[in-house]
Amino acid sequence: AEGIPVLEDRATPLVFNRIPFWLAGVSDFWEAAHDVRRALTGVDEASPVIVVTHNPDVFPEIPARVALTIAGHTHGGQVAVPGLGRPVVPSQFGERYAIGHIVEGGRHLFVSTGIGTSILPVRFRVPPEISLVTIRSAIPLSQPSS
């Protein structure tokens, strides 16, 4: 789309509610060469960073300085069988990064099930979703003096 930057292994600085942060995009782990280091080139070490990527399998490569990684790809496995779990999750890590908010070593990953399907048009006990992620600053905003 015109005027919208594509963040394939690159980052852009943003400001929201007077809080500066970086948004970095990492190419799809399975579909293309991806370079996390290149995606974070130029990002100030002290600035908060949010990484967006298609496939959560890249999460082990994301450095601890990244505040949040957001991904999709797995569709939550599309099928969840009570007592058996998710028999098929398109990930080298199985159910580990299949769905939801995952915290590992103090790092945060959010994986959405999305609204579509892959291979077969079937979902069972894994409803489609459009996620709303609320991000709050750990640093309180200074109040203007009166």
Regions found by a protein language model. Name each.
Residues 2, 19-22, 47-49, 65, ...:
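Envelope-exposed proteins and targeting segments
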Residues 10, 27, 113, 134-136:
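Residues at the C-termini of beta-strands that transition into short coil/loop
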Residues 139-146:
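Non-catalytic terminal accessory segments
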